[in-house]
């Protein structure tokens, strides 16, 4: 009688990969998939929020724009934040009718989220800086920032002078409201690297050419629709006409070009230079649906592309809901830069919200 063959035990355990290898792999994945990957395990959630991951992404040249949408749900005091997420089974481009693009806005847990007291929010790298608005009609100098890597709100140093408006160009430039507005001393500069504020120096406000670059655009929300550009290099100002536009909620700047949407359905762009400005229609946009007259429309600089968000009410909805839609549009200059054409890469309904939910801000950070 033959003896039984000895049983062979097969190891089924799956040893963990070294953490640095996992980080290297995750750094090569688009951040659009991170909200889904964070659901895999607690360790994945920890890695996706780790500074090492984003350092690796930067070293590998894998940083990308990340869309954030801030909404206000009545009667809540604190806003809710959402980010664009892509389903893992998303196809390259949805060309079939009624086929979803696979893009969604998903809620993100925000730690220490402040109430909606800020009047402006600007993106500098992976941080979103919220500049507090007036409290009981008094200018406020408080500044908070959202770290888009860990989704945590932190406090930045307070401004030396309370502000009225803000723009940025690598650094943030804020027009103060507590000093002589005719003096350039009311302009403050915030270095996001050193986390310090400084005014434009007093003696004719002369400073190093290497410290400040480009232009600062400040829009005056008046019927004349005028704005001012400040050139830190030359210490000169130009008045820019914006053709009498009053609604600046649907506007963004990409490079040196201002894009805006008008309620009549037009997308326009303005190039400003040498004291002159020209307004032209954004051409192309084939396939982009017509927005409702009542729609709230937001434009975002999405890494050089134009991201458009708008809302539509859900017909015959018993729960009184509305849909938020999103479109990604690539831009191309033609005819010696006299024309700009937009190509709709995708558009889709990305979120369902109560109909009394309000747009607060749409913005993109680089992570």
UniProtKB/Swiss-Prot annotation:
Keywords of this entry: Kelch repeat, Repeat
Highest rank taxon of the organism: Eukaryota
Residue stretches of each Kelch repeat: 127-171, 172-216
SMART domains: FBOX
Pfam families associated with the record: F-box, Kelch_FKB95
InterPro entries in UniProt: F-box-like_dom_sf (IPR036047), F-box/kelch-repeat_ARATH (IPR050354), F-box_dom (IPR001810), Kelch-typ_b-propeller (IPR015915)
Signal peptide annotation: none
Residue ranges occupied by any F-box domain in the UniProt entry: 11-57
PANTHER family noted in UniProt: F-BOX/KELCH-REPEAT PROTEIN SKIP4, GALACTOSE OXIDASE_KELCH REPEAT SUPERFAMILY PROTEIN
Protein's name in the database: Putative F-box/kelch-repeat protein At4g39600
UniProt source species: Arabidopsis thaliana
